[in-house]
Amino acid sequence: MLFELSIGAIIGFLTLYLLKRFNESKNFITPDNLKKIPIVEGAVPVLGHGPAFSKDIMQFMKNCYKKYGSVFQLKIFRTNMVVLCDRKLSEEFFKSRENDMSLYDVLNRLFFGLAFSDKPDSLEFIIKMVKKTITIRYDDFAPKIMDEAQRLTKIMRESHSGKKLDMIPEIIKFVSRTSARCFIAMDIDDEFYDALNKFTNLLNKIVVLTYFVPHWLLNATLNRFMLRKYRMRMTKLLENEIEKYRTDLNKSDSLLFRKCVDHIDPETGATLTNQDIGDIVVCLLYVSSENTSLLATNCLIDLTLNPKYWDLIKSECSAMIALGDYKNLFKAPLLNSIVMESARLNSHVFALARKPKTVNRIGDYFVADNVDTISLCEPALMKFEIASDVYANPNSYDPVRFMAPRNEPKDSGHVMNWGKGVHECPGKQFAIYEVKAAIAYIVTNFERFEFNHNDLKINYFSPSAMCEKNISVEFIPSQQNIHNIVYKDRTYIVEHIKCNETSAWLIYNALDRQQQREYYQYTYEISTDSQEHKLIEKAGPHKPFPIAYDKLVYTGQSNCMTPTKWYDFASDIWELLTENYAELGFPIYDDKIRNFVPNSFYGQLYSVESIMPTHRDQHVDYGLSISIGSNCEFVIEDKTILLPSGSVLIGDFSKISHSVSKIFHEKPDHLSDFEFFNRVRFSAQIRSIDPDVQPLMTTQEFLDMISEY
């Protein structure tokens, strides 16, 4: 009721105030050496370009760029805004100092100063204190992030399984709890989170209202009677924890609390009150939870709309999740790329803005005194056609653009959501860790979401740095088919992949790094004198090419010494599977399984251009496929999986349609000093063949056959 009354009062004062502002006008003389910024036509009284802007924000911005160029001025209700769609000017924008173009003035204009403190001029101090205390203690924070992501998964399984819901609130809770555990060393309870959630939702509404409602009115209504009360409730709940740091001067579980309690104003000698410290915490939790949760949600929606990448991320992360291996998870190349791609494609239309103070120019353009903000149109520089100077097909979802050999830029000056320069977000890397953990746990524990794309609602004018995508999704737990198998004092991560006629088994960590080095070097040495080591130099890079083979299935020929080391390895893998057949669903009663004796070996090298078309093996059935080197995008029937270096795929390949659709460029560092003949991935197939079977073709016929791939 109070909110409705407040809105009524706001509307009552709105017309008089905005009419007054509309009637105020000035003439500004442009200096001879500067260009005049073109003003977008079509502004209407009081509302400015608001109506046209709100119909289709992105198309409106594209139309403005097409008509007026890379710099133009528009009016959104009571805000005069200069918009930059120019990469060179974005560099100047990021280099500007606070006293020239102010971020804090913009934030105060959006009501953040009044939102976070009873002292409106304290926002700059609050943000500086947050920056000073955001130190990422990786080994301390990473396990907490993983623990909270696991908790999120458990809640979704136990409380929301089979229900349709908006995922944003659950992700916000995950981020809030994670940030609280890491930065203030506290588990926030439901009472605190309820206040934070109400504070966040109301502040988001107020931020939007600031574009057409004066601050004094918002402060006298929504802030005084509602927003401030939520903030005070949160700071009250923090008092007991703050007092622990006042009592114990050596307590340092939270760097933020420690720094705040120890802070002494250099001019007045005053210390911070509990309320001051609480305000800093509220600011931190609001900023971190809002932006990070939207990015995580956008990533999951983008993965849903691009199912191949959902499957690939699941494949890349499954073993790391099973082992609790956060170090490799946070470094996983494809996971990192999908986070940056969703950030690039899902920015707020004007996430970065500054208030001109001591400057009256940007580049060669004159900035008039009536300009309230200078804003970067981030989508223009990241995903509009304008961005094709940096990004290939910029409006398309293509995470591998950031990976070698393309290496399209993902630094702060290009993927701009966290800002750059003096005002770059200090918690950027921490936020990315949170997003990666949430994505990895959700993708590996739930089926890919299903929804009608037409039901997706997108707000590019949200109160956050990211656009807000809203859709209700159903969390359906996926079948847990990944197993931790202990064999010979070592834990192996094995995934049971069910196919149409049979199954396959993927052992993610069959070979550790040292073994990968040993086995590849062994393969190279036993075939050193073969003609294939010379022929591969002339072979086309788009074709996989053999370097070592023994008792080749097709010809019965060998070009190397008997690879005993490989056959012993295959026997161990077979024993691992048969000893754990019940858990893994391995068909030990199949005669082909019981009689499997590894005696045929085929090792080939792939370049980044190599592919293997979809096929079923015609002359062999069960076997092992070992991967060493760059990751491989492997299609197995209707599933796309990632074969990492050191993995082994086992199955009856005569009953499984399979192909190699992509080779990633990044060969692991631990293999960088080995001879790969300018290729990046080694694949070995080990089979069991009948020694009495006659050869199917000559060696030359075999070489002619593989040249057709």
Swiss-Prot record:
Organism domain of life: Viruses
Pathway membership: Steroid biosynthesis; zymosterol biosynthesis; zymosterol from lanosterol: step 1/6
A Pfam family the protein falls into: p450
Keywords from the UniProt entry: Heme, Iron, Lipid biosynthesis, Lipid metabolism, Membrane, Metal-binding, Methyltransferase, Monooxygenase, Oxidoreductase, Steroid biosynthesis, Steroid metabolism, Sterol biosynthesis, Sterol metabolism, Transferase
GO cellular component terms, A-Z: membrane
Keyword flag Disulfide bond: no
Single biological process term from Gene Ontology: methylation
Subcellular location: Membrane
Major localization listed first in the record, in broad terms: membrane
CDD domains: CYP503A1-like
Keyword field contains Cell membrane: no
SUPFAM superfamilies, per the entry: Clavaminate synthase-like, Cytochrome P450
Major enzyme class: oxidoreductase
E.C. code: 1.14.14.154
Catalysis: reaction(s): a 14alpha-methyl steroid + 3 reduced [NADPH--hemoprotein reductase] + 3 O2 = a Delta(14) steroid + formate + 3 oxidized [NADPH--hemoprotein reductase] + 4 H2O + 4 H(+)
PANTHER family in the record: 24-HYDROXYCHOLESTEROL 7-ALPHA-HYDROXYLASE, CYTOCHROME P450 FAMILY 7
Entry function: Catalyzes the 14-alpha demethylation of obtusifoliol to 4 alpha-methyl-5 alpha-ergosta-8,14,24(28)-trien-3 beta-ol.
Protein name per its UniProtKB record: Probable lanosterol 14-alpha demethylase
The species this protein was found in: Acanthamoeba polyphaga mimivirus (APMV)
